[in-house]
Regions:
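A domain-start/cap signature at the N-terminus of enzymes
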Residues: 6-82, 108, 137, 166-189
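Serine-hydrolase catalytic machinery in alpha/beta-hydrolase-like enzymes
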Residues: 62-66, 73, 78-164, 174-177, ...
Length: 189
């Protein structure tokens, strides 16, 4: 397991996502005492008893994600770790779900895995706001993940001390950003 911990002299104000409501900004800037928005999550489709896709509005975008829980998971009696898995530039959540193999690992090791879909830019490419691809700079991905963590704490009873992120390519960059900006992310790989 590869673990990253971020620390710098840069203040959080220097690295915050654009949250002014333009170009998809959300309602959270990552710092201060601002309220984290409640997500209105809707079931889109069910893959099987353990896996389903969901959608929620955030900022100017409809955001999608796939959730896989291990067999016989009961959120009322069990608190499990949470792993976000992020696709690369031009990738898709269903694709990284298929080739990452995390569903099987989650079943064996008992954790919840969430495959989050990045936003689509004006060129039809999908990705994340990591200050690399200009067409995603106005997207508040950090605020969205903060709201997702709040949702999973309330709806899935996740273990707050075991929230992780993993990603491929641009999704890996987003995982780095989450680890640096969100204290809830314990490590990335």
């Amino acid at each position: 397991l590869f673990i990253i911990h971020c620390s710098s002299d840069v203040s959080s104000e220097d690295i915050l996502s654009d949250n002014n409501g333009n170009e998809g900004g959300g309602g959270f800037t990552g710092g201060g005492n601002q309220t984290i928005p409640e997500l209105t999550v809707e079931l889109i489709s069910t893959y099987n008893d353990q896996t389903a896709s969901f959608a929620t509005p955030y900022g100017s975008f409809m955001r999608n994600f796939i959730v896989h829980t291990p067999p016989n998971f009961d959120y009322q009696t069990e608190s499990l770790p949470l792993l976000f898995v992020l696709h690369g530039y031009t990738g898709r959540a269903p694709s990284i779900r298929e080739y990452s193999g995390f569903d099987q690992i989650a079943d064996e090791e008992r954790f919840i895995v969430v495959y989050v879909q990045g936003t689509t830019d004006q060129f039809g490419n999908t990705g994340w706001n990591v200050n690399v691809v200009a067409s995603f700079l106005g997207v508040d991905d950090v605020g969205f993940f903060k709201a997702l963590i709040k949702y999973f704490k309330a709806s899935y009873n996740i273990d707050s001390n075991k929230i992780f992120s993993s990603g491929m390519s641009l999704g890996g960059f987003m995982s780095y950003r989450l680890a640096c900006e969100l204290e809830e992310i314990n490590s990335i790989g």
